[in-house]
From Swiss-Prot:
This is Large ribosomal subunit protein bL21. GO terms for biological process: translation. GO terms for molecular function: rRNA binding; structural constituent of ribosome. One of its GO terms (cellular component) is ribonucleoprotein complex. Keywords: Ribonucleoprotein, Ribosomal protein, RNA-binding, rRNA-binding. The gene is rplU. HAMAP family: Ribosomal_bL21. It comes from Thermotoga maritima (strain ATCC 43589 / DSM 3109 / JCM 10099 / NBRC 100826 / MSB8).
């Protein structure tokens, strides 16, 4: 089993070949572009473990940007008792879907 942990946008994600990664919106890339993650923190390949200090040298993860979209709406309610007042707000966060094509060592 081959998987890696990559760091992007201040977060770490576990990725495997062929899977789809949902991450914060990557503004610099358009759908169809190739994206390369060179900040690989950890790699596991057939029982062999590589841990970076802080990153694994020579390792990179290559993916393809599928789409930019918005996530489901998160609703918040602020209610003030005895004031006959409440405020409802909603927020939809942008994300980028990336198909992981290969993990290179």
């Amino acid at each position: 089993m081959l998987y890696a942990i990559v760091e992007t946008a201040g977060r770490q994600y576990r990725v495997e070949e062929g899977k789809i990664l949902y991450t914060e919106k990557q503004k610099d890339y358009s759908p169809g572009d190739e994206i390369v993650f060179d900040r690989v923190v950890f790699v596991r390949k057939d029982g062999e473990v590589l841990v970076g200090k802080p990153y694994v040298e020579g390792a990179k993860v290559v993916g393809k940007v599928l789409e930019h979209a918005k996530a489901r709406k998160v609703k918040t309610v602020k209610y003030r008792p005895r004031k006959n007042s409440k405020v409802e707000k909603g927020h939809r966060q942008w994300y980028t879907a990336i198909k992981i094509e290969k993990i290179e060592l």
